[in-house]
Amino acid sequence: MIKLCAFADEYGKQITDQIEGLTLNNIHFVELRNVDGKNIADITDEEAENCYKRLVAAGISVWSLGSPMGKVDIDCDFEEYKVKKVHRLCHLANILHTDKIRMFSFFHAYDEREKVMKYLAEMVKIAAEYGVTLYHENEKEIYGDTLERVLDIVRSVDGLKFVYDPANFIQCGQDSAKTIAALFDNCLLYTSDA
């Protein structure tokens, strides 16, 4: 069965507007990316709890967090990053009653394969401690932006799942027919404009 979810922040910044947009379109699952003008990674526990209550009252479940996890330079202080972003987002996922987080594979990382795979594996392990699964999205200018590198991640990082964004592959000059054929069995499908 196909379940539709949406980034409702494209309808409005405020959670009340997002609920309105989802309700008008008969969508019962949201991928939370921004709440009341704040990135999901920056909301407080109290804001997360209030958001969850409002969504549930409207008959909407949080499908996943549309997080910025991994949208950072590969040369970041990774020990600090794990605490400030990875653990924090997994904690928020628990408050919001979701077991999925969308994430990415680092900027300026094309020549840092070993470090990328090590960091991704550590992030997957942390997420598992919270009962959360990470979903890597292909995106321009991160390590996993081409079919070849996404397949490398698929083969190298156990427990990591994938979000397939055809528009992002197109932006990287990839043939969408080849990418979907190669990744179809390993991913969730995401649609957007290119």
Regions found by a protein language model. Give the residues of each.
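N-terminal pre-domain/capping segments
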Residues: 1-94, 98, 128, 132, ...
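Active-site acidic/histidine proton-transfer and metal-coordination neighborhood
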Residues: 16-20, 54-57, 72-164, 171
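Beta->alpha turn/N-cap motifs
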Residues: 33, 164-166
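Short gly/pro/ser/thr-enriched loop/turn and capping motifs at secondary-structure boundaries
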Residues: 38-39, 168-170
